[in-house]
């Protein structure tokens, strides 16, 4: 692997932003390691891109699954240069008191515990190597709020704080960044916005801008709340 090629680890690669990023990183010559919950989509993606890329069925809310995945990946590929905690879940549009305990917990588990599980099992090796960038996907709703998405807002505000605290714990050569990807036309957005989601960039359009942006992140970005600079996605 040349010095310019990176090993990129992405959660939530089954569809949406994760899938689009995986395909764009690969197109640019980088090695992608990823996970998702859909066995069908993961198998299809692995067949499509082949080795050295490595995709696995993993539920990031399950710490034991993440631990086993990390053990295998670190042994086979070493620590990633870029770790993208992208997997996410949003509650159905409803007032907070109408959200069941189970639905609330699911949002918390995917959006907050999931990144913590991945960090727990991958970042120690990155710290040992004294290099790497961790990007935890936040949202515009991690810096503002809206009605009927209170659980989602809560998790994204938490991700902002968690990431900035993590940034203070890393050695000077590393970085942890909370990232607002912008507003992108994905299944998640359509569940909130309905038909108006079509007015925003697709995941594939977004990835063409986001991936080069992510590849430029370094130690000087540690702790900085950043936003992908894509036209139309930040309105």
What positions do the PLM features span?
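C-terminal helical subdomain
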Residues: 172-174, 178-179, 186, 195-235
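Conserved glycine-rich Rossmann-like NAD(P)H-binding loop of the short-chain dehydrogenase/reductase
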Residues: 28-44
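Conserved glycine-rich cofactor-binding loop
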Residues: 14-15
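Residue(s) in the substrate-gating loop at a strand-loop-helix junction
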Residues: 139
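Substrate-binding pocket helix/loop in short-chain dehydrogenase/reductase
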Residues: 94-96, 103-105
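Active-site helix of classical SDR
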Residues: 119, 155
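The beta1-alpha1 cofactor-binding region of Rossmann-like NAD(H)/NADP(H)-dependent oxidoreductases
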Residues: 57-68, 101
């Amino acid at each position: 692997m040349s010095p310019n090629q990176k090993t990129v680890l992405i959660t939530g690669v089954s569809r949406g932003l994760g899938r689009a990023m995986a395909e764009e990183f690969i197109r640019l010559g980088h090695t992608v390691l990823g996970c998702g919950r859909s066995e069908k989509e993961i198998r299809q993606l692995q067949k499509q891109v082949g080795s050295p890329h490595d995709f696995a069925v993993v539920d990031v809310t399950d710490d034991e699954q993440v631990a086993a995945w990390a053990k295998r990946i670190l042994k086979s590929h070493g620590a990633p240069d870029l770790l993208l905690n992208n997997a996410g879940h949003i509650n159905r549009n409803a007032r907070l008191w109408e959200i069941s305990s189970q639905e609330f917990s699911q949002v918390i588990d995917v959006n907050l515990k999931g990144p913590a599980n991945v960090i727990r099992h991958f970042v120690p090796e990155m710290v040992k190597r004294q290099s790497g960038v961790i990007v935890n996907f936040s949202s515009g709703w991690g810096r503002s709020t809206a009605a009927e998405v209170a659980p989602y807002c809560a998790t994204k505000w938490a991700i902002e704080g968690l990431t900035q605290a993590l940034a203070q714990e890393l050695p000077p050569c590393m970085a942890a960044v909370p990232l607002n990807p912008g507003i992108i036309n994905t299944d998640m957005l359509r569940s909130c916005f309905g038909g108006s989601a079509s007015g925003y960039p697709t995941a594939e359009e977004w990835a063409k801008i986001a991936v080069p942006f992510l590849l430029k992140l370094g130690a000087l970005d540690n702790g900085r709340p950043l936003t992908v600079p894509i036209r139309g996605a930040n309105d």
